[in-house]
Amino acid sequence: MARGPSLDTFISAADRALRALFAPPTAARPVPAPGPAAAREAQKTSDSALTPEEKRESAALMRVNHAGEVAAQALYHAQAMFARDGEVREFMLQAAREETDHLAWCETRLEELGSRPSVLNPLWYAGSFGIGTVAAMLGDRASLGFVAETERQVEGHLKSHLDLLPDADLRSRAIVEAMRHDEVGHGQHAQSAGGMRLPGPIRELMRQTARVMTHTAYRF
């Protein structure tokens, strides 16, 4: 019979939550930069060349992405905390570490654009931690299936942002593309590790929940 989380695990979870919400995130990987051809163009088109409207749009979209990464931290931490299998737990923790890079990249970009993260990040974290806990309690296959479906939806969301970001904002576009690549990898790993396909109503509920967060974080 699997043992429940220890007191140290709960303390560690609280520490991770405080770090995700209030401490500057530290990335293990550098902020993605445009490719060689795009980089040459980027030297001609700096942030100062973006119109005020383009800057506001980029900032709003990157704020949404930052909020999504806060939620991802909570989901992965909760699912790792209640995972039955050690390999599943390690996968969740490794994915959370990669999502920390995303969090740091988005925060850096928001600062460059003169903007800020969502003021509702504590709400996104708390809600996502609860959702991740429920998914993990249903068993590792359900938890992995939840990751696979979440990342599939996130990939679609990031692809839509590549269509919405101003063409001249090459820096934001490079960050979003690198994030998308990682999310695809997480989803594929979860699926190959035995993740079950979630029922249609659950997938739709996930879409609607993400839509609420996206629309709210865009503004606040």
Q: Model features per residue range: what roles?
A:
Residues 1-220:
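Non-heme di-metal
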